[in-house]
Amino acid sequence: MENTQNKLNFLSWEEAKNKAKTFLKDFTIKEKIRLMYGSAMNPGNRCVGQIEPIKSGIFKPEKFAGIKFCDGPTGPRFQKGLTNSWPTPINLASTFNRKLIYEVGKSQGNEFYHVGVNVALTPCINMFRVPTGGRNFENFGENPFLTGELASELIKGIQSNGVIACAKHFIGNEQEKYRCASNSIIDERTLMELYAEPFYKAIKKGDVGCIMCSYNAVNGVYLFKNKLMNDVLKDKFKFNGFIISDWFAVYDDSPDSINNGLDINMPGTKSKIPIVGDLWFNPSLWSKVPKYVEDGLIAEEKINDTAERIISTMYKFSQIDYFPKKEFYSQSYITENTKKLNRKAAAESNILLKNEDNILPIDLKKIEQENKKYKIAILGIDAVKGEFYGQEPNFINFIIPIKSVDGHIANGYGSGTTTFKYIVDPYEGILNKVQNYKNIELIQYAKLDKEDNEDIETSVEKSKDCDLVLIFVQSISGEGYMKIGNSFGDRKDLSLLHNGEKLIEKVSDVNKNIVVIINAPGPVNMDWRNKVKGIIFGGLAGQESGNGIADILFGEVNPSGHLPFVIGKREQYPADIKDIQEYDILSTNLSSSEALEFKDVVNYDEGLFIGQYWFDKKNEIPIYHFGYGLSYTKFVFSDLKCNFNKELKQLEAKFKIKNIGNYEGGVVAFLYLTFPLEDEKYPIRVLKGFDKYFLNINEIKECSIIVEEHDLSYYDVDSKNYIMPNKGYYTVYIGQSSDIKDLTLTEKINIE
């Protein structure tokens, strides 16, 4: 594969803006307006939207080559299996590994680049506000600091290949239910410090080139015309790139959208998808813009600013001078190197939640030395391939009616998915490990009955005399335009599909040596957890999912994943999506006055207290804390020393980690702060630093985490700015999860 970066010439924003002014010098006002809306949504062309080229005239060269947009968070969409299907962002977040996520972004960017995509519609940086949220798997978890840090690495990786990343969905889009006709009520402090924070980091650390606004309204105004685009992104955060609408999210033809910060309306023209047809399209806006400019309702300077933003962003990422033509069918971009990286990310994202009696890892050499038969039962439909992965029509991707899931889940569904060229299921991954060991006998069984439930009776019989039972269970969610299993986008509940809870409980009656592997987009019911010895949360880990799980089970990879969300019972969470029901999402997004009528009001009354912060505030004990994750080895933290640099306004925490166990492995160090604030509306401890360290047996590492001024600040509503407290003590906590029992190092430091 051609090395993308050899031909790229990246510019500073200032250089790019100067070039854009020169480039646009001969453009008419109508040609500049033509940059501001798309021309089609046609998956048959392998991109989800585009801005058409602008020609100088008949038989004359193009003045502008156009822009092609493509989803998404797990790799290029609609590529007929030519590109990789990567672990979902929630899995990437579980690694807490900035370097790894940068490499995944870099590899994804290379794929987007070589198929001719200018703008990759990724990453999603909404918050894991409710445990049942349909698109939780497309995001990086419940914490704004974590999300901003990791999303910035993915952005930098993608954009290192000259592909513009698009951070989405700005803002307050944490559920699928009536997402196109809902009104999120969010107070200013919560909006700025929690939900806007990942966008701040995407801009300041990731230097993201594009941001997408969401379908919903915030505080009574739909985002496509909400002044938050100007006030927050462009003015306060100094965003230099361009803002696009979500697809079909411009509901009226007033000048408000352009005046309040929207730069591009997507997809801009009638959809070519039959099920969508004439819905969601209001073409009259763009025919009216020239008249709006003529009448002074839209300033010509606004049109110029938008055009310059679009062209300067393309210059910055070397897309004007050199960019390949669309080559969607040219070749496969699945290589041995991408498979290796994919597998590494999948394995590192697995989270070991329980390991009673050291039931894991499975020691194949020891079993062979004992020279007796060792029987492993592999139960559950999630252990084997189903009908969904591969070429059309059998893939979870777009608007395809599917009753349920009948095999291993490695992705959610909707626009954040890909077409799988292949998938390694867990049974295949396990078989590859044991096939050369004559004493290992695998007993695999999975069958769904007419009610779509596991055949529990047979599963129990097959597991009775086994030395080890591996039970694979699942749940799924996705974008809210179709129903699968227990979800219509958002999950109706936290139950496992196919009566998975009953399968675990019945098998546990006849065999105690059970390891449960969960493939799901987020928390599930775990009332059965005390009946098994081992639990792994595998998330939705992409095409190498089965190999990644097998690497953990057999100890080839020491688990180092940590939860990017808290796991509790549904009633313990501060927010929920009530009355999830089957509704036609298309009918809530018509280009008419009906679309402007709110069908749901979502009150963010919990303020800053989502996820673990809520559990801390209420002294609730979760099932598993944010950041929890076990290893096959043990680590000890010691010797914390903190220093505050008044000149740089930085806090540095130095400490040591020692691996005192019998395996080499990785561990995440979390830095939490208690702010010098007497404010009951502020969390008790906030995550403001983390890093991942890999240590050999008996190795000691000297570690350092630096907290910058912005992360030492809070949002002050009166001054409408981020400010540091001017006196008092921060309390610094260092440890292996958010649980106060794991935060073993602590020190107070004076900032005066």
Residue ranges and their predicted role:
Residues T744-E752:
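Intrinsically disordered, low-complexity regulatory regions in eukaryotic proteins
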Residues M1-I740, E752:
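Glycoside hydrolase catalytic-domain context in secreted enzymes
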